[in-house]
Amino acid sequence: MLSFPNKFKCSSWYRPGRLFIVFIVVALALLTLSCQKSSLSNAPQSGKGGGEIIGAGSTFIYPAMSRWISSFQSSHKGVQINYQSIGSGGGIQQLKKGVVDFGASDAALDDKQLQEMPAVVQLPESAGPVCITYNLPELKSPLKLSANTLAGIYLGQIKTWQDPALRKDNPGVELPKYPIVVAHRSDGSGTTNIFTTYLDKVSPAWSKQVGKGIAVNWPTGLGGKGSEGVTGVVKQTPGGIGYVELTYAKENKLPVALVRNQAGQFVEPTADATTAAINAFSNDLAHDVRVPIVDPPASAKDAYPISGLTFLLIPKQGKDPNKTESLKQFVQYVITQGQDQAESLSYAKLPSGLQQQDQTLLAQVGSKSQQASSGGSQ
């Protein structure tokens, strides 16, 4: 019988029965690992099919949009939304190029623009005042501005704060001797569209010399990019005046002017005053949500005259059905529960009639039976 040195003797670990068991265990482990790897590669990833939803556009709506996104994502863990506050003009262009999944604009698309875009719906999701903010530390009471005075300032015709037109609007108020420094948007802006639509309506001189739109040739002033830029110019410049969404003025502790409406009332820019402006145009809006709500008639005595709707622009047929469905859920949230959040940020809640119109428009998103561009007349 052959003998081996002790170090070569078979230990109990190498017994044939044990070897068979080890082989089975190793084989099962390898099989399990292979199955796990296969299932991981085939399992839906977080956000797969939907991915990140990207929107861009209005700075006017950015404070509300940020709140909406945060609240929606807290209850929809698999959805990620990224909104880029680049101005309404930029948002429209990004959507037109297919770079983003939705746009936001304070300037509704006209018929020509709709024809140039992929099939989209545009639905109003909020409204708010474009406030006139200023930097006059010596002034203890709110500045009052009539339509002609405001137009004269932005035309460069009224150059100092002690101009007779300003004295007339503010009787008994000691106005400072500062020169007026006008601030305006330097980028394509829906806020500019609302503001210039107002000036175009109330001032024949403005209408003839400048007109209206998301970008105009300003007769005077310093340009700032975004509402943040305009706010910055005003805040840093004694004697400065600019137009921004109300939240930007509040956050920077800047005062806002009372603007005279057709009823002769100097009205503060508030959510309620914006709602009064919307209600003044309710019949027109029922036929076309794009109707401007600036300079309402004298019957709307409590209405703020420089108010505007802001719109979401949504492709009817997104590139990814899952992402489109998530976007629809987000918009549904915005036009329902999100309205209370908007109101807390000084935006006006949409009246029930506009909310119902929004539901009709939103139903067209993802519907293959609807291919024509929408968002104009109903």
Question: Where on the chain are the PLM-derived regions?
Answer:
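A general, composition-driven signal for non-globular sequence regions
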Residues: 9-12, 30-31, 62, 93
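Bacterial N-terminal signal peptides
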Residues: 21-32
